[in-house]
Amino acid sequence: MFSVLLFGCGGGGGGSQGGSAGLIGFAGNSSGQGGSGQSGGTASGGTATGGGTAGGGTTGGDPSPIPSTTALVTRLGKPARVLLGLGAGNPLDQMKSQDIHPDIVDTYLVGVGAGAWPTWNSPDGAYITYTAQAIQAYGAVPMFTLYQMATTGEGNMSAVNDTAFMTGYWAQVRLMYQRMAALGTPVLVNLEPDFWGFVAAQAPNRDAAQIAAIVSSQPECSALPNTAAGLGQCLVQMGRQIAPKALLGFPPAFWSGTPAEIAAQMRAVGAHQADFIVAQTTDRDAGCREVPSPPAECTGRTGPFYWDESNQTSPNFHESQSQISAYRAALGNGLPILWWQTPMGVPSTTPGGTDLHYRDNHVDYMLRNAQEYGDTHTFAIVFSTGGQFQTSITTDGGQFARLSSQYLARGGATLK
């Protein structure tokens, strides 16, 4: 069951096999929206107790500030370099067979109610326990992408004020945090990709405080407003209280304005109080959108799609870095960045490709130029498929295994 559901993020495409919407000019939205006890410290709103903070801090009485990236990576128990991760479409057995050892492994949690992620193992919620333990046994940090809001259809804002749906929704969020707390170790949590873009697109004046939502029914959130803004704040507040070792990140969707405007929208939902920023790279191999008759998951956008490695023409890598940097500055609190759902195709001068073998150059560029990302406050890059027809480590001809090995042999990109 969940081998299919792992492709949960939809970017507006509807259904379990879509991909996450990314940056304006780079990925857009396929629906057409715009083109406890602590380990190293407790982060809350960019402040810390103990040994560090997601937004910078100090350790051991040393008054020197610790970069936010270093502080977060230290809490994860990983080396002080830009970390590499793998997500959906890249099974552990393939990592093992190719001797790939990622720092992070990402897994989707999808659905609400019958057939949702809590039911995938027994007892309810054990999917988190078993998945995390397998990932940890392989030496990686578990990351979970919470993708429950798309259950009733992406962009369906009526769900957030529906008592039956939200009762199930919050029960599963609580169960998620309880299972994470029981692990006793840090995990990363990516909170509801795409949803915040739909909130901004549909809210009057793009203000999440003007969409009604059921929030204050949760004891940890009784003082929060019953709005979509309060919903985001509750995800953070509940996590802090139930699973203080969980590190939380919000993914902005760049459909609704400039980086500064989107930062204001995301501050309203509490994104500045999280531990990191989830930068949605782009959700499809470029070649999948270039073919004359693309699969459904690659339709609905206009090109060009293949990014310019010389960074002279649009779209290109420096543009996307600048956009996220501007967002980070406007959001405040100096949060570190995790690039997510980064496509895994292989470079080619010939546009297009075939299913599972479409061209793309993100792996090649980002692993060869990882220091650019380290210099812009990145602490991790997670590579994964955004749909069932995209390239993975199973079909990339060994590209990721080779380039990640070379990256690690060079010592990795330093953190800023």
What residue spans do the PLM features occupy?
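Aromatic- and acid-rich polysaccharide-binding/catalytic face
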Residues: 102-107, 263-312, 383-384
